[in-house]
Amino acid sequence: STGGWTSGAHGSYSTQEFISDEMLQEIAAVDGISGYDASIVSMPYYFKETGDSVVTTGYTNSFYTYGYVNTEYNDLFASGRFELVEGSHITEDMTNGLIISRERAEQNGLEVGSKVVGINDPYTDDPEVDMEIVGIFEVVADKNDEATMYDASTMWDFSEYAFCSKAAMEAMCVNYGDGNKIQEADFFVTDAAQLESVINEVQSISSINWDHFIVTANDEVYQNISSALSDTTTLVT
């Protein structure tokens, strides 16, 4: 979405329009779209039922966490960089699911079915949100190559990434105003040859003010996995 900040008599306020659940459903219903994901990103902390922190290898025990609708469509999984090795992906009907890496699960004695509590900032009055680990992923990379195990854009080791249900992230970030709103979403199409026509149909949805949003085509995932999959999809952002 587009927008920014402006000032008025009562201070500064956001001019950005965010993506609503209704918009997601309308776009997902367009013929030719096979699935979508939408995310909210934050760096919460997780705690075991004993009250002990779920620890990382970093200076703090926070996890770089995506609050997701459908983790199956996240580009880290779709491109093959992450592989779900236990449990299931987070889906739209899950409200409290959590996926963590095998490294952090083993370090903390956690497994699929373990209960944890998520808090965006445990040093404030942020709410405690009950979650359950539904999946465990492995970073598919050369573990001797530091560049493939670390995301320079976020400064987080990939093993300290996590994925939770969008509803759980919204609950954790309830004190942060626009911090729990969706700013972007990714949609997959079933046939790359129909990409342009699908985009045109999406942009013809009259209930969405397209002056406030940018639509781009991105085939990175398609290029990365087209040789491995027979039903490869192409990404629309």
Regions found by a protein language model. Name each.
Residues N218-A228:
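Alpha-helical membrane-protein architecture signal
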Residues S1, S226-T237:
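Hydrophobic alpha-helical transmembrane segments of multi-pass inner-membrane transport and secretion
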Residues T2-E220:
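Basic-flanked hydrophobic alpha-helices used for secretion and membrane insertion
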